[in-house]
Regions:
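Short regulatory helix/loop adjacent to the ATP-binding pocket of P-loop NTPases
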Residues: 106, 123-138, 153-155
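A cross-kingdom feature that marks ATP-driven nucleic-acid transaction machinery
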Residues: 2, 25, 34, 49, ...
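Interdomain hinge/linker elements that couple catalytic modules in large macromolecular machines
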Residues: 2, 148-325, 334
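Walker A/P-loop nucleotide-binding motif
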Residues: 19-37
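Conserved P-loop NTPase "ATPase switch" module shared by AAA+ and STAND
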Residues: 82-100
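Structural recognition of the conserved hydrophobic beta-strand(s) that form the central parallel beta-sheet
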Residues: 114-120, 141
Length: 413
């Protein structure tokens, strides 16, 4: 079964011949190697590139062990470049190549070499790899499957597919499992034996219980504001564990750096400035989030909000959490000041939109609640309410667009 990743293939095609090292990043098991060695290679051939001009090397293959020596590998590549036409060099698990940074920099000096790499050590599973090749690297970040990609292989209705996607996420080795029990087992194994170990080893964390407890707290509170000091107080009160807010923020940064979670900052829409704390965190994959807390607390409202955030990021938006400050007077003439929340403030180039997530709109009161912050924004940018049920897209008298979660998740904004 082949799951097409058209968005990423297009990004790879757009980056050809740009003189930079194409670095494919993303959490383990999200499909980086398959994208490069199957989908991208297939596209190159369809575009007329013959096999002699595609140089492949999977360094984790025992048969290629000899080429982990930097000199032998470099000479091997040089021996295959026989003319002035472009050669595409595809390298997997490149961290197993000794002195790989020096070798890759050397390959960049070959004028007719276009280089693409993936890796899965601590450096490649974090943002450090881009720092290593600053000015010479071009990152293509791969996420778990989108709902659209998931539905391309799911045998069932959109509604049942959506329920399963919220439950098990979009990691390819998970969704390809035949039963729910198998999906749960794979997710738990991946968390304990892969993702957790990566973060612990990379950052030399000795007390894995504290890290796991922190992630459980973040998992339980997706869509909620997170303040490290309040987390520290919770550890002390509920767990009788003394751990400082600075340490907790460092642990959160470790998880963010490993692409497991993402931070959304708060943005004052009217004041046009960022608010330092608190902020929100969303999980890169909902299946991993659910596995962390043993598939308890499966509230569709919060899962839907997380899924919308991830889809916006896939579509290339920078995403913040909006705050609209309202000043007024009550019926007694007493002045008040309150803050209304906009779930997402989304920016991409000159585009901006404001989005509210609502599982359902059963009454006019609920509709008024959801649009209360949006109708106070009058800067001319799109305002959208995404509803977690089927409906025909429509606009209200304020110009606010109402659309179903299916229309949003299956189409670009």
């Amino acid at each position: 079964m082949i799951i097409e990743r058209k968005r990423y293939i297009q990004q790879l095609l757009n980056s050809r011949h740009n003189g930079l090292l194409k670095i494919i990043t993303g959490i383990r098991r999200c499909g980086k190697s398959f994208l490069l060695f199957n989908l991208f290679k297939r596209q190159l051939k369809l575009d007329g590139v013959d096999k002699e001009h595609i140089i492949e090397m999977a360094f984790d293959d025992f048969g290629n062990k000899v080429y982990r020596d930097p000199n032998k590998f470099y000479q091997y590549v040089k021996s295959l470049i026989k003319d002035g036409r472009m050669y595409y060099i595809l390298l997997d698990e490149v961290q197993m190549l000794k002195d790989f940074e020096d070798v890759l920099n050397g390959l960049l000096h070959i004028p007719n070499a276009d280089i693409y790499v993936t890796g899965s050590n601590a450096k490649f599973l974090s943002k450090d790899i881009i720092t290593e090749f600053r000015g010479r690297g071009y990152q293509i970040h791969i996420s778990p499957l989108s709902f659209s990609e998931f539905m391309s292989v799911y045998q069932g209705s959109q509604e049942s597919g959506w329920v399963e996607y919220l439950q098990y996420g979009g990691l390819p080795p998970v969704i390809l499992q035949p039963t729910d029990e198998d999906k749960i087992r794979v997710l738990k194994d991946l968390w304990q034996e892969t993702y957790l170990i990566d973060i612990l080893n990379r950052n030399r964390i000795k007390n894995n219980a504290e890290l796991e407890e922190l992630l459980c707290m973040l998992s339980s509170g997706i869509g909620g504001l997170v303040n490290p000091q309040k987390l520290s107080n919770t550890f002390k009160t509920n767990k009788n564990i003394s751990i400082g807010s600075t340490t907790l923020k460092t642990y959160i940064d470790y998880c963010s750096d490993a692409f497991l979670i993402e931070e959304a900052k708060r943005y004052d829409v009217k004041g046009r400035k960022y608010i330092s704390t608190p902020m929100k965190y969303y999980f890169t994959d909902l299946g991993l989030r659910n596995a962390l807390i043993n598939f308890r607390q499966i509230e569709k409202t919060h899962l839907m909000e997380n899924a919308i955030y991830c889809e916006l990021r896939r579509q290339g938006f920078n995403v913040d959490v909006g705050v609209v400050t309202v000043n007024g007077k009550d019926e007694n003439g007493t002045s008040y000041r309150k803050q209304l929340e906009v779930d997402f403030v989304c920016n991409k180039g000159s585009r901006r939109c404001y989005i509210q997530s609502s599982l359902s709109l059963p009454s006019q009161d609920k509709i008024e609640q959801e649009i209360n912050s949006l109708r106070r924004i009058d800067d001319g940018f799109e305002r959208i309410v995404i509803v977690g049920e089927s409906l025909i897209s429509n606009r209200d008298a304020n110009g606010i667009l109402f659309m179903s979660i299916y229309d949003f998740m299956l189409n670009d904004l």
